[in-house]
Every structure is written in C-alpha cells, then in structure tokens.
C-alpha cells in the first residue's frame, strides 16, 4: 500500500516534466520564428537601403573626363597634337574641326565653319597690313635693315595662306598617320605612350612662354622709345603712333585703327613664332614613329628571327617613309619660310648688335630677342634632323642580324635604308640633317662679314625712322 503513493508521486512529476518540455518547445518555436521574421525584415530593410543609395549614386551627373581612360594616352600623334592645334585656331591658324577628338575620323574642314571664316578675315587683315608696310617702305630709302617689316608681315601672310591649305588636307593626313601607327609594334607601357605627347606639350609651352616674354620686353622697349620720341602729350597715343607707324603714315590717328594695329601685331608675332614650333612638332611626331620601330628592333637585336618578321618590319619602315614624304609635301613651304626668315633676322640682329644700345630696357629686349632667335633656329634644326637620324639608326640593328638569320628580306631591308634619303626638306632645296646646322652657321658668318664691310654706326632710336626698322 505504501508503494502506490510513491508511484503516484513519480507519475505526477513525470507528467509535469513532459508538460513543461512541450511548453518550452512551443515557446522556442515561437521565439525562433520571431527571430527569423526580424532577421528577414532587417535584411529587406538593408537591401532597400543599398538599392536606394545605388540609385542616388547613379542619378548624380558624371563628369565627361572622370573616367580613367580619359587621362591615359594612346600614343597617337593626333591626340598629342590636339591642344597645339587648338591654340593655333585661336590665332586664326589651322581651322580644322575636331582636333581634340579621340579619333582622326572626327576631323573635318569646311569653308562655312566659323574657324575658317575667322582665318579668312585675319588673312584679309594681314594683307591690308602688309600693303601698308610695303607702301611705307617704298616711299622711304630702302636698306637691308628697313625691309624688316615687309619680311616679317610677308612671311606671316604666306604662312597663313599655307596653313589654310594645310587645314584642308589635315583630316586625310591624320587618317593616313593613324593607319601607319596602327600597324607599328605597339607600345609596351603607358610611359612610352605618354612620352611623345609630353615632349610636344613641353616644346609648345616653352616656346609660347618665351615668345610672350619677348613680346612683353618689346612693349617695354617701345614705351621707352615712344616717351623719348614723343609727338603728342598723350603717352598712349604716342605709343600707338610709333608702333603702328605704317598705318598712320597714310592716315591720321584713330583709336580704332590703333587697336587694330596692336591686334594685328600680337597675332602676327604668335604666328611668326608658331611656324617654327609647328615644324618642330611635326618632326617630333615623325621621329617618334621611327623610334617606335627601332625600339622593337633593339629588343630582338642579335636574335634569330623568321623572314616574316623582317618582311613585316620592312613594310612598316616603308610606310613611315611614305608618311614622311606626305608630311614634307604639306609643310615644306612653311619649313622654307621658317629657315629663310630666321637666317635674315639673325643677320639683321647681329648687325644691329654693333650699335650702341640707347637704354637698358632696349638692351635687355635686344639681347633676349637675339638669343631666343638663335636658340629657336637651333632647336628647329636639331628636331628636324632627328627624323633623318632615327631613320638611319635602323641600319645599326640590321647589321647585328646573325648569319643564321640572314635572308633576302634582311638584305632588301638594308638596301632600302642605305639608299633612301629620309628627311624633311625646304621645298626640296635642302634636307634637314645635322650637316645643315653647320651650313647655316657658315652662311650667317659669311653674310655677316660682308655686311660689316658696309656697316655704319646708326642711332637705334632715330625718331625719323620706324621703331621696327
């Protein structure tokens, strides 16, 4: 009888345990479902938040040059020379549309374009200015020194006309240039792609800065000259009367004509310097294409290469030579004007250096101008001759071909390099090689010795003469 109460108590305890466990399980399931629901809601909230942020980020306007590709150079001449031509367009030269485009196919020329109209308007203005200068010179005693305004303005007018004709050919020239570049061995690094464009930009920047400095010094010297030879009480009017004397030689003073003369002088000075820079820039581009081919030949120097390799490189070399001929035909007149112009002005400046300088400002301007002129002429000669130097450098690598790899293609390639005279020319009268530097120097010395025999010490600030004569 005592066993039954004990058994009953045990059954009660067991029933409580079973009941309590099932309750806990139900509670656990409820809690688990609540946790899952809360987790899903938090995930949905987070997902919606991310999507909203993504939509907001995409809705913001993107900058056109924010992409990485916009800052990388493709190594093409078209891209490297784009900004240079853009500056030239501001000064009424090379009126070509699309010079800053990514591909040469963006280039176009039209007579109805505003760039072309501006260029034609400035050509007409330069023609009128040249006519006034010619009239003044012919109505005064003519000397080697007095024809400076005619040489200066005549060369500027000629370069403007040639540049307008070159602008018509430029899209086709750049398309052919792009075709040649595409077939060449590709650049290995971004640095090699960037090098040509960087060199062109630095040459343009340095040339324009020195040209601007020369013009500022010229203005300071002209102000001193105008104050020394004052015709009127107004210093500004006196300055324009002295610096634009070819205009007021045939008409009375006018503020409009004075501003037109100053505008003409500033633009003409830029164009006079730009024609040298343009020859240098084209030379840098052509020389870099030969260098691109030579770098590939240097990488395989002394190795046994298949005949197909030499055949491909020979065709690439021939294409660059054809490109040089096309560019030379297009710019040879500019090259001729550049060298003849520099030769004349160096002779004139050296002859004037024998005279006594009337002021410190004039002396600073004169010697800065002379050094800049000689340096610019030397730079044009050396950069232009680099085309010939790079074309001949190919022969050095061909002579290192092993005996086992010697084949008719290598022999043919070598004969082409030896027999061809690859260089820019001045209308086919002379080739721009390193020998030309010595020839020009010898010519200047010869002319200078002859001119010294007839030289007379003159007053550089003769108020009866033009400031620029």
Curated annotation (Swiss-Prot):
Residues 1-117, 168-199, 287-330, 375-435 are cytoplasmic. It is found in: Cell membrane. Residues 139-146, 221-265, 352-353, 457-469 are extracellular. It is a multi-pass membrane protein. GO terms for molecular function: ionotropic sweet taste receptor activity; ligand-gated monoatomic ion channel activity; sweet taste receptor activity; taste receptor activity. Expressed in Gr5a-expressing sugar-sensing cells. Glycans are attached at residue 230. The chain crosses the membrane at residues 118-138, 147-167, 200-220, 266-286, 331-351, 354-374, 436-456. Pfam families: Trehalose_recp. Keywords: Cell membrane, Glycoprotein, Membrane, Receptor, Transducer, Transmembrane, Transmembrane helix. GO terms for biological process: detection of chemical stimulus involved in sensory perception of taste; monoatomic ion transmembrane transport; sensory perception of sweet taste; sensory perception of taste; signal transduction. One of its GO terms (cellular component) is plasma membrane. It comes from the Eukaryota. One of the few identified sugar gustatory receptors identified so far and which promotes the starvation-induced increase of feeding motivation. Required in combination with Gr64a to detect sucrose, maltose, and glucose. Belongs to the insect chemoreceptor superfamily. Gustatory receptor (GR) family. Gr5a subfamily. This is Gustatory receptor for sugar taste 64f.
């Amino acid at each position: 009888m005592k066993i039954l109460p004990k058994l009953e108590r045990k059954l009660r305890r067991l029933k409580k345990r079973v009941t309590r466990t099932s309750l806990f399980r139900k509670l656990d399931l409820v809690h688990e479902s609540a946790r899952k629901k809360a987790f899903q809601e938090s995930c949905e909230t987070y997902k919606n938040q991310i999507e909203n942020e993504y939509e907001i980020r995409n809705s913001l306007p993107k900058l056109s040059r924010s992409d990485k590709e916009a800052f990388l150079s493709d190594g093409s001449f078209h891209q490297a020379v784009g900004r240079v031509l853009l500056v030239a367009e501001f000064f009424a030269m090379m009126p070509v549309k699309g010079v800053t485009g990514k591909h040469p196919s963006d280039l176009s020329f039209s007579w109805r374009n505003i760039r072309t109209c501006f260029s034609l308007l400035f050509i007409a203005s330069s023609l009128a200015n040249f006519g006034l200068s010619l009239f003044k010179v012919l109505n005064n005693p003519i000397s080697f020194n007095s024809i400076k305004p005619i040489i200066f303005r005549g060369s500027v007018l000629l370069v403007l006309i040639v540049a307008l004709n070159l602008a018509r050919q430029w899209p086709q020239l750049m398309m052919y240039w792009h075709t040649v570049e595409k077939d060449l061995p590709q650049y290995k690094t971004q640095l090699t792609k960037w090098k040509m464009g960087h060199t062109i930009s630095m040459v343009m920047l340095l040339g324009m800065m020195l040209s601007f400095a020369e013009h500022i010094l010229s203005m300071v010297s002209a102000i001193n000259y105008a104050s020394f030879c004052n015709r009127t009480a107004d210093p500004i009017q006196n300055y324009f009367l002295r610096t634009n004397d070819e205009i007021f030689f045939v008409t009375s003073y006018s503020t409009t004509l004075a501003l037109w003369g100053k505008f003409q002088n500033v633009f003409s000075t830029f164009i006079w310097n730009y024609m040298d820079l343009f020859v240098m820039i084209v030379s840098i581009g052509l020389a870099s294409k030969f260098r691109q081919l030579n770098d590939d030949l240097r990488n395989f120097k002394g190795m046994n290469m298949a005949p197909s390799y030499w055949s491909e490189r020979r065709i690439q070399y021939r294409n660059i030579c054809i490109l040089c001929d096309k560019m030379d035909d297009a710019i040879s007149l500019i090259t001729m004007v550049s060298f003849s112009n520099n030769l004349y002005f160096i002779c004139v400046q050296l002859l004037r250096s024998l005279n006594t300088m009337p002021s410190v400002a004039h002396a600073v301007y004169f010697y800065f101008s002379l050094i800049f002129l000689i340096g610019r002429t030397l730079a044009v000669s050396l950069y232009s001759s680099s085309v010939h130097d790079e074309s001949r450098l190919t022969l050095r690598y061909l002579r290192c071909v092993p005996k086992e790899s010697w084949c008719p293609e290598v022999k043919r390639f070598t004969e082409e390099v030896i027999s061809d005279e690859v260089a820019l020319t001045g209308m086919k009268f002379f080739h721009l090689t390193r020998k030309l530097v010595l020839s020009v120097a010898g010519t200047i010395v010869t002319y200078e010795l002859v001119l010294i025999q007839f030289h007379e010490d003159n007053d550089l600030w003769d108020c009866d003469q033009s400031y620029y004569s």
